[in-house]
């Protein structure tokens, strides 16, 4: 099927922004002012259009293209055309390979156009859906559904247009993934004095306190406390897809999909290395993008945002000083973090030390 491919260029603009025709006025901002609806009808042609892929996937080279294609593919999409006051004018479903459709019989005037793609089968949109429905924390998708190879990664986007009576306008709506991607980068074992590397065995990388659900609109917001992890924790319900077997010599090509998390309640999403030291369990949890950088580091401290990639490079020095809890990081003063802010098609790179 036809896929919508995502490129590097443009912060928070994964697809081409709004394309305007002579009879179409477009704004990237929201206007909550109610307009008087015209009884005259208009038509709108909506298209999802992407750029050539530039993402470097974290998989073996022979599989990289397939994963990239899966992450970028739009299998289906639903277009909602809302009036300025938030009530629904019309909606229409698009299915690959045809990701463009003309919606006729619309009321003239200002519109909000919302597009959702790769919608999980568990989601049902009400017949009388309102624009505010997408911001309701009770209307969410579950992290369990975010599999590029099967369902595709959920995407959403919106724009505003003004339709003229008895004419057809055309617009291309920008969409982006709600999920973010966490990649395990390098692991360097450089033991300090008193920490015997022969007593240390590294076995797994897990994500802990990943948000279990997310709202579908822009922006995606934190939903009621539901957390998943690669192992069970005080906060996290165990999910096998958040755990990867690793060793000190074999840890490349490991990645996870997670939902946005702004550290509400102090519950930042963590990447935790799991192992043993002298036969006893040892955990090395690290908050992801948890603070602004210093001394040349460019981290922004915004934790996890939608449609970003976070690569974490880890240096382990105090092998015998791991945490006893996979959800309790070390004192932040003991961590050195370097983050390079980038979008999904690029990456945020974080270097952490234990």
Task: Kindly give the residue locations of the regions a language model identified.
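C-terminal structured domain segments
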Residues: 281-337
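Structured, solvent-exposed acidic/aromatic patches
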Residues: 59-62, 70-72, 85-87, 107-109, ...
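Bacterial Sec-dependent N-terminal signal peptides
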Residues: 21-49, 184, 307, 352
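Structured interaction patches on ligand/partner-binding surfaces of diverse proteins
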Residues: 122-170, 283-296, 305
